[in-house]
């Protein structure tokens, strides 16, 4: 966990271009922290005053962009929970990486035979039930095999038994439109 100096920028739920200031920055945020676990959760927590200029605009499913640490580019998170504290006059905002939307997609049936993770990722993208504009990249050069049936793409990459992380090892890194396996 790392405290964030930059204030999150608020965007509408259906935004696709984040090269602007959206609805504005949550400059009055009292707390902003990104939590990222290796091959696991990637979430943003914000405490914002009810007197803040954007309080009335904040709702579930909206997007927040913030620099998650001192090294990575700003990342987009989707709000999934708002908890109002009427005594403190604040709202606690919880948001998860936008890439979690991939759990709503599915690989029906795909056998990966003696291939690299990059080839497996390319095949996975081709076999998704719904098209995606996410890119999947790996620099691991070893070959192995696995089989996926009715699994979402995030589970294929870093889930339990048979995932690429399980079969090849490595670590995932999430970008706004790219997931890397190193």
Each model region followed by its residue ranges:
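Juxtamembrane "anchor/assembly" segments of surface/extracellular structural proteins
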Residues: 1-57, 96-102, 117
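Short, acidic/charged, Gly/Pro-enriched secondary-structure junctions
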Residues: 2-17, 49-85, 111-133, 162, ...
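Hydrophobic beta-strand residues in large extracellular and virion-surface proteins
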Residues: 8, 44-46, 64-66, 79, ...
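Short, exposed beta-strand/loop patches in secreted or surface proteins that constitute
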Residues: 32-37, 80-84, 171-173
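Envelope-exposed proteins and targeting segments
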Residues: 42, 75, 89-91, 177
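Short, solvent-exposed secondary-structure boundary/capping segments
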Residues: 45, 81-98
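Short acidic, gly/pro-rich beta-turn/loop elements at beta-sheet edges
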Residues: 56-58, 87-89, 103-105
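Charged- and aromatic-enriched interaction segments used to assemble
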Residues: 96-182
């Amino acid at each position: 966990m790392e405290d964030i100096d930059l204030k999150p920028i608020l965007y509408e739920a259906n935004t696709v271009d984040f090269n602007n200031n959206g609805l504005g920055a949550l400059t009055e945020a009292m707390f902003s922290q990104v939590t990222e676990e290796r091959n696991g959760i990637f979430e943003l927590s914000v405490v914002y005053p009810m007197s803040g200029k954007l309080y009335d605009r904040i709702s579930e499913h909206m997007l927040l962009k913030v620099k998650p640490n001192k090294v990575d580019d700003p990342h987009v998170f989707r709000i999934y929970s708002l908890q109002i504290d009427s005594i403190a006059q604040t709202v606690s905002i919880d948001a998860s990486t936008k890439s979690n939307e991939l759990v709503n997609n599915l690989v029906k049936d795909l056998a990966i035979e003696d291939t690299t993770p990059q080839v497996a990722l390319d095949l996975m993208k081709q076999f998704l039930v719904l098209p995606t504009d996410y890119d999947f990249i790996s620099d691991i050069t070893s070959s192995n095999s696995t089989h996926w049936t009715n699994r979402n793409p995030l589970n294929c990459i870093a889930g339990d038994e048979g995932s690429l992380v399980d079969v090849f090892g490595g670590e995932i890194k999430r970008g706004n439109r790219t997931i890397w396996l190193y």
